A protein has these predicted regions:
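Short acidic-glycine-tyrosine-enriched beta hairpin
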Residues: 90-105
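Alpha-helical segment of the N-proximal tetratricopeptide repeat
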Residues: 131-163
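Canonical tetratricopeptide repeat
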Residues: 173, 207-208
């Protein structure tokens, strides 16, 4: 079905959306897909995206929302089809299609697809704070990174830093892209700046394969 738009609403099916870049350096190529629902509908008041994965693959990668501070996003996971096994702070939850799972920012979570094509919609926002969408160049940078074009990825990420000069994750990603592009000095500069902003970035630096 085609997308419909008028003054009061926008309609689209998830099947109409093209898979979007994975927003993590070094993410495994395991068939998981991300759909940028927020950007497709030009939503600016909250974050929303969807993930789809084959059986046995993590639909939701293991993470917390407080790695870089205590004001991370509160998230609601909606199992649209298929089924998933959630693991949240050591507890297991079986979530068939139609399930809603709300997770606090500090909780460590992941969800594994039990069926091929399991799809989860994720809605998130930081309690008590207005939502601030990431610059488009951040997604563009990862699109280039995922094709091996590290120079373009770095160029796009530099634009992100012009808009968010005090963003630790933005500096960290720029450091990863610079390292892949063979620009060691610039990589160290960005990583050093990220560590100045928050020492919590050490966990990412220690585990990221781009920085080996």
């Amino acid at each position: 079905m085609t997308t419909t738009a008028n003054q009061g609403y926008v309609f689209a099916t998830l099947e109409e959306l093209e898979p979007a870049p994975t927003l993590a350096p070094g993410a495994p190529n395991d068939g998981r897909q991300r759909f940028d629902v927020r950007r497709r509908f030009e939503i600016t008041s909250f974050g929303v995206q969807a993930f789809r994965a084959p059986e046995g693959v993590e639909v939701v990668r293991e993470h917390t929302e407080t790695l870089l501070g205590e004001d991370g996003q509160e998230e609601l996971y909606i199992v649209m089809n298929g089924a998933a096994t959630f693991e949240i702070d050591g507890e297991t939850i079986e979530a068939p299609a139609g399930s809603l799972v709300q997770v606090r920012p500090a909780a460590r979570r992941k969800a594994t697809a039990k069926d091929d094509g399991t799809t989860i919609l994720v809605v998130g926002g930081t309690p008590g704070k207005a939502y601030e969408p990431a610059p488009q160049e951040a997604a563009d940078a990862f699109a280039a990174y995922n094709t091996g074009d590290f120079e373009t990825a770095l160029a796009k990420q530099r634009v992100v830093l012009e808009k968010r000069p005090n963003d630790a994750v933005a500096h960290f990603n720029a450091g990863c892209f610079a390292a892949r592009a063979g620009l060691g000095d610039e990589a160290f500069d960005h990583l050093g700046r990220a560590l100045q902003i928050t020492e919590r970035i050490k966990e990412l630096v220690a585990t990221d394969e781009d920085l080996d």
